[in-house]
Amino acid sequence: MTREEYLHKLLYDHNKPKNKQTANPKKYPQGYFKSKKCRKCGKEFTPKAPSEHYCCEYCKKYGEADAYYRRVYGISIEEYLDLAEKQNFVCALCGEANFAMGCNHTGCLVVDHNHKTGKVRGLLCHNCNRALGLFHDNPELIQKASEYVKV
């Protein structure tokens, strides 16, 4: 999988509802929304609403994903993609690339981080990340579980 293919999967392969934002340009003194530059690519465009900051769906999704990773994990989407690329787009624990999250839906890798320090450890599949969370990131408990399943 290439970086571009993975980015497309990250941005588009989610079953999230799309928000439609509409505003009436006639309510503004000039009768239209002023042109502005896209926050992602810099292209000038005429927005459909004053709060619109991106020229196209791709730039919007990219910008939203970047804002999410910065807000929640303190990394940019480029840093996320660098991590994914270093891991060959597979889970750092189980090595799976296309893990199932439900009926006909495969998920992207999620950011695993230390909840005490906030430091990003790597990218995991949903199942491995959930398993670590259920063990409360406790190395002793994980070791005990490892010994237990060897029996």
Regions found by a protein language model. Give the residues of each.
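Contiguous alpha-helical segments
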Residues: T2-V110, H115-V151
